[in-house]
Design a protein with these regions (language model features):
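Helix-adjacent hinge/juxtasegments
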Residues: 52-87
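Short beta-strand segments at enzyme active-site cores
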Residues: 39-43, 123-124
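Acidic active-site catalytic centers that drive phospho-/nucleotidyl reactions
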Residues: 6-8, 47, 107, 126
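Acidic, PIN/NYN-like endoribonuclease modules and their adjacent C-terminal/linker elements
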Residues: 111-155
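Short, well-structured N-terminal submotif of metal-dependent ribonuclease cores
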Residues: 1-40, 55-69, 145-150, 155
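Active-site neighborhoods of divalent-metal-dependent phosphate/nucleic-acid chemistry enzymes
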Residues: 79-123
Length: 155
């Protein structure tokens, strides 16, 4: 079973401000590379670059990564993971997701990738852990019960 990975998981891999989440994200992503079970949406790569290059007040105005470092990391993501791209169905499904589930545009867009491409899970800390949106279950890999402890939708 393949899972779609939200940008927040990828950002934590490069964010030393929360060592526990950084370690968990790194372990999860490394395991996903080996197993081939994690997929990134084009949106997650774009959001990753924007998030890690944005100035951070708590870092004295410095970003998590320089633009050059972020570009290298984004290119590695493109090389290491399967990346899915938007099409008409993804956009239409996202538009419906904002109305049906009350999701923000970016969350609805990420969910739409999973729904349209047939992924059973989204790994994210931005949605409600364990909730199903259509055929897609959201799992927060940082939650106490973790990725593999939730029962499948149709067991």
């Amino acid at each position: 079973m393949a899972s779609l990975v939200d940008s927040n998981i990828v950002v934590y891999r490069c964010d030393p401000r929360d060592p526990d989440k950084q370690r968990a994200a790194d372990e999860l992503l490394r395991a996903g590379i080996v197993s081939g079970t994690l997929v990134l949406a084009h949106q997650s790569v774009v959001e990753f670059f924007a998030a890690v290059t944005r100035p951070r007040r708590d870092l004295g105005g410095a970003p998590l990564l320089s633009a050059d470092e972020a570009r290298i990391q984004a290119e590695l993501l493109l090389a290491e993971f399967r990346v899915v791209y938007p099409n008409r169905d993804v956009v239409q499904t996202a538009l419906r997701g904002t109305a049906t589930y009350g999701l923000s545009w970016f969350d609805a867009h990420l969910w739409a990738y999973a729904e349209v491409y047939g992924f059973e899970e989204i790994l994210s800390e931005d949605f409600t852990h364990g909730r199903h949106y259509g055929t897609v279950r959201v799992v927060n890999p940082f939650a106490a019960d973790g990725v593999h402890e939730l029962p499948p939708l149709y067991a």
